[in-house]
Amino acid sequence: FPLVLSAARLGSIKPGNAVTYREVKVGEVTGYELGQTADRVLIRVLIEPRYAALVHTGSRFWETSGFGVDFSLFKGASVRTDSLESLIEGGVAFATPDGEQMGRRALPGQTFALFKEPQEEWFGWAPKIELGRAASDK
């Protein structure tokens, strides 16, 4: 199930990087190119067919490369990392909201913005979405 992610810069993303949903690999980056007017990078990803139902018009994608550190005088330091694989390799993660925010199922080839980092609320999204069957499950 092909999708396109649009970003200002490529960053550390490269073909073969994982695309994850809830830290489970559901696809991978297949390539990239400059957009038609060279002001964006278009990153091609392929979601495994059985996981295509996870992607809706309200889904949000973000980079998982590296780790983030947030330091506050009163809170101490908090470190944000994704899976060890994405920490080393980089990659893309996404989340899909509940209810009306979810929107319709994405269409093949649909374009989504790729955010540099996630918003905290995205981690709280937990819609129940029926998954498709992979050909190997039959």
Where are these regions (language model features)?
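Extracytoplasmic/periplasmic terminal helices and flexible tails
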Residues: 1-138
